[in-house]
Amino acid sequence: MAFGLETGPDTVVNIKVIGVGGGGNNVVNRMVRSGTKGVDFVAVNTDKQALNVSSANYKIQIGEKLTHGQGAGSDPEVGRKSAEESRNQISKALEDTDMVFITAGMGGGTGTGGAPIVAEIAKEMGILTVAVVTKPFGFEGRRRMQQAEAGIAEMKDKVDSLVIIPNERLKHATDQKITFANAFEIADDVLRQAVQSISDLIRDTGFINLDFADVTAIMKNAGMAHMGVGRAAGKGKAEEAARMAISSPLLETSIEGAKGVLINVTGSMDIGLEEVEQAASLVQAAVHPDALTIFGAQFDETLDDEIRVTVIATGFDKQPGEPLPKMAAAEPAGEGTAAVPGPMPLNEEDVDKSEDTEPDPFDDIFKIFNKRD
């Protein structure tokens, strides 16, 4: 039975996170261990052994007749056929679901080929469908990147909203040494915080309340999406948290030019009106002048001096991989502490070679993050 979020006397919103393939399954396992609440988890894989160690509430072995539980062998076509073979099982797991996050590492077999089929089924069932996928590291090779790009292009046509995390950006997320293991945890945090934030928005009654209809208005049939959560404390915390929410170094998008944006500001009862205005104004300045803006505010006494800003932006004209304009870098708050969120998890099997030698438009943003303690 799905986990229900009460949003009113007669309304329950059911949210699921589905990890497809090895990378997607690993994301689900880490999210379960982190204590993410308000959602149910589903693991989908051709690899029976991987499913046996999954922490998901539901486990679906796809393509049993085709692969005999041995995996897809990095062949997206095998992944696609396996998901097609198991359509009924996937549909069953999605019953009574209102919103689904599909996570997969693009470039391999099961995730690349199977995730678009899972998305297609979800959309056919009328479920708000959001995908958070990763692109391979450069060292994983040209073929894997080509498969990833093809899988992402197919996903874009199957989902309501799509968030892309290029694994290559992980090395820019911090100036500290990143191990191969914790690199994936950093990427997972993008999805975890986005999922937790949305479930909290729907579940918790705020001073200015947001509900599932608001989330749907921004994310339904929206194409590329940006999901970010910024946290900061101390001097200038409102602007710092907002800046981090709109410019995660892990994402392939910024919110510039977005035509739909949901902004939620959370703080203690002591949060000042001026701080709320600063955070909202910074976000508004970056989106399209005529953007549909939905604003919410909540109180959380556990935050003390901290402020949290959640931003979901959609309605971009730019396509995945198209260069983004360079954003102006602002000085970080001297005493603030911030956690960069962002949108999504990673696949440990996904890694490919980036041959792009043009200047990275996020360089200035990376410098801001790397200055922080």
Where are the regions that the model predicts?
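Tubulin/FtsZ superfamily GTPase core signature
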Residues: 1-373
